Amino acid sequence: MRSLVTLCMIALCTILQAQEANIPKVFTLGQSEKAYESLNQSYSKTLLEASNGDIKMAFDQWLLMMKEMDVYAERIDFDLNGVKLWLHVFWGANGKIDHMGYLLRSDSRNINDAELKAFFSSFMNRFTFPIKSDKPFNHYTGATFPTFSVKVNN
């Protein structure tokens, strides 16, 4: 019985890895739904959980990544200003971005889809998230560019 359970677990992991391998590193949300569901299962830990429940740290590190995207876009002369999207980021346990899914919001300015995918792909190859975890993790939220933030001291 124990070996049957082990065999089933190995088969499930193999199937999930195969499905994950079929999804591009950068993809449009709403495409490849089965592969996307597989990513959500493989990266089931949230950014907040990876931050040990510290919402301030999770938010600050997310904001840092958004600002790094702004800086990188400016450095390579890629105009992100006015882009508004839903963004789902999947990190490996080591903080490297493994996958990014996005969907432009209806109030976003138009941007070439292939160029945006190329930008995200290039960015994720250069950026490592400061938070590390015992398991892969993810975060899904809205993002707008440029990134504005103001610290308020209470």
Where do the protein language model's features map onto the residues?
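Bacterial Sec-dependent N-terminal signal peptides
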Residues: 1-24
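Charge-biased low-complexity segments
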Residues: 19-154
